[in-house]
Amino acid sequence: MVSLQVSSLPQTLILAFLLPQALPAGVFELQIHSFGPGPGPGTPRSPCNARGPCRLFFRVCLKPGVSQEAAESLCALGAALSTSGPVYTEQPGVPAAALSLPDGLVRVPFLDAWPGTFSLIIETWREQLGERAAGPAWNLLARVAGRRRLAAGAPWARDVQRTGAWELHFSYRARCEPPAVGAACARLCRSRSAPSRCGPGLRPCTPFPDECEAPRESLTVCRAGCSPEHGYCEEPDECHCLEGWTGPLCTVPVSTSSCLNSRVSGPAGTGCLLPGPGPCDGNPCANGGSCSETPGSFECACPRGFYGPRCEVSGVTCADGPCFNGGLCVGGEDPDSAYVCHCPPAFQGSNCERRVDRCSLQPCQNGGLCLDLGHALRCRCRAGFAGPRCEHDLDDCAGRACANGGTCVEGGGARRCSCALGFGGRDCRERADPCASRPCAHGGRCYAHFSGLVCACAPGYMGVRCEFAVRPDGADAVPAAPRGLRQADSQRFLLPPALGLLAAAALAGAALLLIHVRRRGPGRDTGTRLLSGTREPSVHTLPDALNNLRLQDGAGDGPTSSADWNHPEDGDSRSIYVIPAPSIYAREA
């Protein structure tokens, strides 16, 4: 941290900060938008220390844009100080996110022609205040420096610079001060009183048609008494008259009856020739060059930094370091050779001065989201796509194997396996237990079967999942028979006995089934499958059999054979139904 006591500052240093008093060719203007802690990690710093409040001010230094330049070298193009900002007092626990800044612009006048390429140095200083400060002290907080390229009269240029823990946002521009004009402020506009053309070596000013443009060197001390309005000089002790004036001091108006340097015939009867178009009309010289008429042609006087017949070639070389943001300069070191900047991928422009919005080119395919990380681009792909630019479509079954007879299914931006019965998981490698969810209600026992699952219902319940209760009186034990099969009303009294016989037959069949299972020997108590070779009764066929019993006059037998039923190992009488399970277990990959 640089710390200087104001009392010890030499007068020469303070005078170096002040604006020069000579008539400037133009003014460089700087606008500070914000200064504060940067976006990096950590707690934001306070510009003041523990000794009390402080306030900020800025110093601007302009130097020629050379490739190697010592920080201590003089500000050859000019320097200036801003006003002091409002007093800032640190508040504990409150981050210094927005610091109070000085009002107005920082102006740096320049005397010579504007170079176009220059070095800009901005210093942020702190003035410590308060009783404990032991006298005001200036401390350098931050310093940013960089090369810039800017033409006089161009729009405001914005920039952001970071140094240490601080971040500075600012704008800058260069403009000519009247009577200077042009991209380099190398030409002057002088007033003329006569409506005729400007004299030799002069041309009308573009922004001021009633004035004449002359080389800036015409500020040379002219002959004593030379009219400042109608005369000018290119060398000391000269006095050249503007058109319409004559005399040694350009104070005598030319008679309207005389003819001046004319090219075309005037109106009939005047005997004079009126001015015609000249080779310098329209300013054929680029980049602020000045045009001079020669016999049948013209010559361009180019400002510093440009050359060529029309000043169209930049005289800046790679030795001047014209490429910004890491650009590679290609060109010879000869002052008469031009240069080309090869920019890194993130920047563009003749001097690599503009950042490229690389995501605007939409490099990510198939709806991927582009992320510009500064040093590289990254694409965030949608489901089903992959690759650096999301160019690979993964919505297919290539290379995807489903085990245990499973089938790969495409769709929805993903792949999945449709598994065979008894298997599940991502690749159908996991065995699936259809009884794991306990599908049998009211205490029914579940058995796995090759065609599905089977529920063995507890006494008093029936149905595919044992969901129906059998009432003791038989009122709603089974669905009613179709209307066409009902007997006459006189036979309805036979229904209760028939239901009683049906219940007895069911109990007898269950007992026979239990005896048959016990006689089968080993393997009968697996609890996971039915006996092979048995016929699975359907929940639909059982009510039909019961209803057929109702059509008889109380007579009828139960099931024809106990071999027609499955026999789980259970001491209770249970009703058994085969439940077709889904043929596949599908799980998304």
Curated annotation (Swiss-Prot):
Membrane-spanning residues: 495-515
SMART domains with a match to the protein in the record: EGF (SM00181), EGF_CA (SM00179)
Membrane topology according to the record: Single-pass type I membrane protein
Parts of the chain on the Cytoplasmic side: 516-589
Domain (EGF-like) ranges: 218-251, 276-312, 314-353, 355-391, 393-429, 431-467
Region (Disordered): 552-574
One of the GO biological process terms: negative regulation of Notch signaling pathway
Topological domain ranges for the Extracellular compartment: 33-494
Xref: InterPro entries: EGF-like_Ca-bd_dom (IPR001881), EGF-like_CS (IPR013032), EGF-like_dom (IPR000742), Notch_ligand_N (IPR011651)
Single annotated GO MF: calcium ion binding
Subcellular location field: Membrane
SS bond partners: C222-C233, C226-C239, C241-C250, C280-C291, C285-C300, C302-C311, C318-C329, C323-C341, C343-C352, C359-C370, C364-C379, C381-C390, C397-C408, C402-C417, C419-C428, C435-C446, C440-C455, C457-C466
Matching SUPFAM superfamilies: EGF/Laminin (SSF57196)
Gene3D superfamilies named in the record: 2.60.40.3510, Laminin (2.10.25.10)
Signal peptide residues on this chain, from the entry's feature table: 1-32
Alphabetical keyword list: Developmental protein, Differentiation, Disulfide bond, EGF-like domain, Membrane, Notch signaling pathway, Repeat, Signal, Transmembrane, Transmembrane helix, Ubl conjugation
Function: Inhibits primary neurogenesis. May be required to divert neurons along a specific differentiation pathway. Plays a role in the formation of somite boundaries during segmentation of the paraxial mesoderm.
Subunit structure as annotated in this protein's UniProt entry: Can bind and activate Notch-1 or another Notch receptor.
Protein name: Delta-like protein 3
Gene field: Dll3
